[in-house]
Design a protein with these regions (language model features):
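Hydrophobic faces of well-ordered beta-strands that scaffold small-molecule active sites
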Residues: 1, 23-31, 50-53, 68-74, ...
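Glycine-rich phosphate-binding active-site loops on the catalytic face of alpha/beta enzymes
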Residues: 1-2, 46-61, 94-105, 145-167
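Glycine/Thr-rich beta-alpha phosphate-binding loop at enzyme active sites
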Residues: 1-6, 87-118
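N-terminal active-site wall of soluble small-molecule enzyme domains
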Residues: 2-45, 55-64
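Generic structural signal for hydrophobic
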Residues: 17, 42-45, 63, 86, ...
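Catalytic cores of alpha/beta
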Residues: 34-45, 78-89, 134-150
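Catalytic-face loop-and-helix region of soluble metabolic enzyme cores
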Residues: 97-107, 117-140, 145-156
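C-terminal helical cap(s) of enzyme catalytic domains, especially alpha/beta-barrels
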Residues: 109-110, 158-185
C-alpha cells in the first residue's frame, strides 16, 4: 500500500505530466503488498493507458477490469504452457519478458536469455517486450529484435547509479533507435 499512497500524493503531478505526453504511459505495480480493490481504484482513476504486473501477482479483479490495458510480466520459472495461455487471454495486450532470476542480474545478456525470449515471442502474436534485467547495450539490440521482441523496458538495475549516469544510459538506447541505418526497428 505504501507505493499506492505515494501514487495518491503525487496524483496532480502525474496528471500534469501525462497530459503533456503523446505516447501511451503505464504504471508498473510491484510486489510490496497485495493490491486491494481500493488501491486498484486509485490506479484506474489516473490517466494511465496500461498497467504492468507479474501474472502471479495480478488479482482477477485487475485482469477482468476493461478500463485499462494489461501488460503482463512473465517471470523466471513460468512454464511455456502458462505463458501461452496468458498470452491468449483477451484482456492481455502485451507480455513483458522479465525472465532473469535475481542471482543472475549482474551478468551480461547471454545466449540462454536470447533463446528464452525467442521462444516467448514465438508463442504469441501479441507484442513481447524485454525487461533489461541483465546488462544490455544498444549494440545488442539488432540481435534481440530479431527474436520477435518489439521493444525493451529499461530496468534501472542495469544502469549505473546516479541521475546523470541513468540519463546517459537511456540516451544511448534513444540514439540507437534514432539512427538512420537502424533497420531492426
Amino acid at each position: 500500500m505504501e507505493g499506492l499512497r505515494r501514487l495518491e500524493t503525487q496524483e496532480q503531478s502525474i496528471r500534469e505530466i501525462l497530459s503533456t505526453l503523446s505516447i501511451p504511459v503505464g504504471v508498473s505495480i510491484g510486489e510490496a503488498r497485495p493490491l486491494s480493490r481500493e488501491g486498484w481504484e486509485s490506479v484506474v482513476s489516473l490517466p494511465f493507458r496500461f498497467v504492468n504486473m507479474y501474472a502471479h501477482q495480478m488479482p482477477l479483479f485487475v485482469h477482468q477490469d476493461g478500463r485499462i490495458d494489461k501488460f503482463v510480466s512473465i517471470g523466471p520459472g513460468y512454464m511455456l504452457e502458462q505463458v501461452k495461455t496468458i498470452a491468449e487471454m483477451e484482456q492481455v495486450v502485451a507480455l513483458e519478458a522479465a525472465i532473469v532470476s535475481s542471482q543472475a542480474k549482474l551478468y551480461p545478456f547471454g545466449l540462454l536469455d536470447l533463446s528464452t525470449i525467442t521462444l516467448i515471442s514465438r508463442l504469441t502474436p501479441k507484442p513481447v517486450f524485454l525487461r533489461t534485467q541483465k546488462r544490455v547495450t544498444p549494440d545488442d539490440m539488432p540481435l534481440i529484435l530479431k527474436t520477435g521482441v518489439r521493444g525493451i523496458t529499461l530496468d534501472p538495475s542495469i544502469l549505473e547509479p546516479g541521475i546523470e549516469e541513468y540519463r546517459d544510459g537511456v540516451r544511448g538506447f534513444v540514439q540507437w533507435g534514432a539512427r538512420p541505418d537502424n533497420e531492426s526497428r
